[in-house]
Regions:
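Compositionally biased intrinsically disordered regions enriched in Thr/Gly
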Residues: 1-214
Length: 214
């Protein structure tokens, strides 16, 4: 009996065209043409799991593209309401082996105030089922171990490049507390369309990466 053929994977970068409002207040009526990129995975044999992952990534990206394309570009069209939109989004593949694939999802949302919010999350998927998996557990850690590792890494970084404003303990506390906050929340703006199973962590070739806010 021949052993089953090992599935191999490749990745293609795809894009969607987006028409992004520049600023309804300072540049009414102006829009910017952008391309938002996301990965599409190809398997050497038919894979329901890969199809499921591709559908999840494409659907999530398409939802934001459609919302941004439909977003008003003049203040009068907003009817006096605060309208939050996604001005930029990029999903990139950071890791893939025979069992797991992981992506990094970066976006910039704004309600047209003094500044918007950059949010970076990660999402890992099982290549056997296509379902999201926790990057922390996939890396063999408990949440407590991951939080401790983040604290150690931040403290080590600040030992050579300290903050001008905050103590090392304060920075470590603030960053590690992010581990307890929903990863779909960035700088006070709730992301409407996060990937299911998103995390503050993602897997990369160098190891488990913790994504801080901007």
């Amino acid at each position: 009996v021949e052993a089953p053929e090992e599935i191999t994977y490749s990745v293609e970068t795809r894009s969607m065209d987006v028409s992004v409002p520049v600023d309804p207040y300072d540049a009414p009526g102006k829009r910017e043409a952008q391309k938002w990129y996301y990965p599409h995975i190809e398997a050497s044999t038919q894979s329901d799991a890969v199809d499921k992952i591709n559908a999840a990534l494409e659907e999530s990206m398409r939802t934001d593209v459609e919302k941004t394309n439909a977003a008003p570009d003049t203040a009068k069209d907003m009817g006096g309401a605060i309208v939050f939109i996604c001005q930029y989004r990029s999903i990139t593949l950071t890791y893939i082996d025979n069992d797991i694939v992981c992506v990094r999802d970066q976006r910039y949302d704004t309600g047209w105030g003094p500044h918007g919010s950059t949010t970076v999350t990660g999402c890992a998927y099982s290549l056997e089922t296509g379902d999201p998996v926790d990057p922390i557990s996939a890396f063999g850690l408990t949440p407590e171990q991951a939080q401790s590792a983040v604290a150690d890494a931040v403290a080590a970084y600040l030992a050579t490049d300290p903050s001008d404003l905050l103590s090392t303990n304060a920075v470590v506390r603030d960053i590690t507390n992010m581990c307890l906050i929903s990863p779909a929340t960035g700088s006070g703006i709730d992301v409407e369309n996060p990937l299911d199973g998103c995390s503050h962590f993602y897997i990369a070739s160098e190891g488990l990466v913790f994504a801080t806010e901007d």
